[in-house]
Amino acid sequence: MAVKVAINGFGRIGRNVLRAIIESGRKDIEVVAINDLGPVETNAHLLRFDSVHGRFPAEVKTTETTIDVGRGPIEVSAIRNPAELPWKHIDVVMECTGIFTSKEACQAHLANGSSRVLISAPGKDADKTIVFGVNHDKLTKNDIVVSNASCTTNCLSPVAKVLNDAIGIQKGFMTTIHSYTGDQPTLDTMHKDLYRARAAALSMIPTSTGAAKAVGLVLPELNGKLDGVAIRVPTPNVSVVDLVFEAKRDTTVEEINGAIRDAAQGHLRGILGFTEHPNVSVDFNHDPHSSVFHMDQTKVMEGRMCRILSWYDNEWGFSNRMADTAVAMGKLI
């Protein structure tokens, strides 16, 4: 039986989660409800026509209270307080507003009768932080409010897991060169982060990220060993992780790349990919992998100082993992 999910917040991630489910053709998950404060027809229009991912691959029909993308009508509401949503029949709520990111805030969803909540962001006090493919096997029926981590943590974690298992990571520092996102302005304006107050499409913008430290929530063996920063750049989608780390023993480019290739062709197939071509960021737009390792960018100095590069579609890869994790949670109900 398909896991019944509802999407709270139909923005970039919410729409792409629905699209990922439809495009994949998977039948183990069914979106039965959407809650968003915008008008139904506006949400449908933004689903039909996407500036980054192109036209929706199916006809989108609407009524005053439903959106239908070919699998039957999806109930659409515009309720501000999640506790008031009529979602007693929902297995997993995908919390995609960016507002209700703590376990405490998500109690409102549980109060309305929903069984589980999956947060599309790092979650404060979540029962568990999951990067699908890396630690989803640690999910239990007692994990009620789960964080899907961030797109960057989803990119870094599979690579870090493979390399730590193969050669050991003593410590490392990550820089994510990250496309601008919806919380950045098109022109200079007020923002609590003065770097992000500047026009997104006009500058490379240094800012913070907790993605590297969050790997410790997913891989306890790396807790405290990784840190990082972000540089937001004037592209609308696709980002890349540049990780420099000290290996626990001497290694080579060939050993690092070989470990990644084996994992990508084995237990991490579909999660971790790799490329041996001279690709640039646009080549990874709409790529469903969490992480695509760039083989010819691997460097090793004096045996232990290592540098790797791994790409990710920060919207599409993450949205596909939201669906994967929701199904894993639903199977435990």
Where do the PLM segments sit?
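Alpha-helical scaffold segments in soluble metabolic enzymes
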Residues: 12, 16, 20, 108, ...
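Structured loop/turn residues at secondary-structure junctions
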Residues: 97-98, 151, 207, 248, ...
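N-terminal Rossmann-like NAD(P) cofactor-binding subdomain of oxidoreductases
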Residues: 1-197, 324, 332-333
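NAD(P)-dependent Rossmann-like dehydrogenase/reductase catalytic/cofactor-binding core
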Residues: 285-333
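Alpha-helix N-cap/helix-start and coil->helix boundary motif
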Residues: 40, 124, 212, 315-316
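A generic structural signal for alpha-helix starts
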Residues: 154, 251, 316-317
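C-terminal substrate-binding/catalytic lobe of Rossmann-fold NAD(P)-dependent oxidoreductases
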Residues: 23-86, 168-171, 176-306
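Short glycine-rich or small-residue beta-strand-to-loop segments that form or flank ligand, phosphate
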Residues: 4-6, 145-147, 241-247, 306-312
